[in-house]
Amino acid sequence: MFLRVTTFLTALLLALPLAARAAEPLVVSVWGGNWKDTIERVVAKPFTAKTGIPVEFEVGGTIDRLAKARVAKGNPLVDVTFTTSHVGRLYISDGLYERPDMTKIPNAKEIAREAIRSPYHLGSWAYVYIVVYRPDLVKEEITRWADLWKPSLRGKIAVPDFDPSHIITIAALMEGGNESTWQKGEDRLRQLKPNIVAFYSTDAQSQDLMKTGQAPVEVMLSVNAYHLQEQGVAVKLVQPTDYPGIVGIDTMGIMAGSKRADAAYQFIDLVLSREIQSQLVESLKVGPVNGGATVPAKLRGQPGIFLTPAEWKERGYIIDDEVRAKMLPAWREWFTANIVKK
């Protein structure tokens, strides 16, 4: 009897570290607000229900979270990071991401080619920056990027100043260039300046400018435009007939040195599943990266929603991630000096 009790107690003590490890949370780094709330509700809760592993969040801005990751290199405070595709390149160049074993992410076989951003990070959803306007305040129809330069739109447009990649690339494309030869669009951008009434640096500012009518035309994130429509603001998203919308793909990566890599693989695989992708589309109004996701009829064919290879190719322009990551500081500096300043 004594031997049995001793053996049982020994086994129990040996099992404690394993149980403790099983209870350790998976830490996910993500933006705040609706992004975090949606990931928690749509992904984290089902993940915990399925695996028994709790999920905690690091919340912050894109660059702030990158800075924290750099400080914690080799002993990361988080396990999975959501960030933009081009900033993901900075994580990679700094050695902050683990190169994943794709056999551990079976749902990755179903995602669009465009969502495989590198051997280190995978797309989670897509959206576009396009022209959005209020037909009740702008009587003429806007159908092209080129319409932004019309004299009739003087003092009516808002654009982002924190990341001018979108309008810089469009201006370059209009002059026969691209993001790599962006200087070709400099003069055209200067010509746009009289039409710009405001700049924004947050989603909230962007939406407020449109709601109040201060800027009834914007280069806007499609997600924000759909949100305004849900609030009853009559905005129209333009499918430009001259150049596509500028695609954004948010991505996921596993932090190098994560002690919860196995759980991280399961989390990422769940995000890419058809069921979760369908819920993300419904909740965030983003485009799925898994073409098998269910998309509401009202969103099919709309800006930022790509379901086939042809739609990815024809209705979206993807800026080269490495060029964007490298050039963004220079673009921001030029844009501030030449467009933002009076």
Can you say where each PLM-predicted feature lies in the sequence?
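Mature extracytoplasmic/periplasmic domains
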Residues: 255-315
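A ligand-binding cleft/hinge motif common to bilobed small-molecule-binding domains
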Residues: 86-90, 211, 216-234
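Extracytoplasmic ligand-binding site segments that recognize negatively charged/polar headgroups
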Residues: 33-40, 77-214
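A bilobed periplasmic-binding-protein/Venus flytrap-type ligand-binding module shared by bacterial periplasmic
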Residues: 130-137, 172-174, 248-263, 268, ...
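Early extracytoplasmic/lumenal segment of secretory-pathway proteins
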Residues: 23-90
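Conserved C-terminal helix/tail region of periplasmic/extracytoplasmic solute-binding proteins
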Residues: 312-342
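Bacterial N-terminal signal peptides
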Residues: 6-17
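Periplasmic-binding protein-like
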Residues: 127, 187-192, 231-256, 301
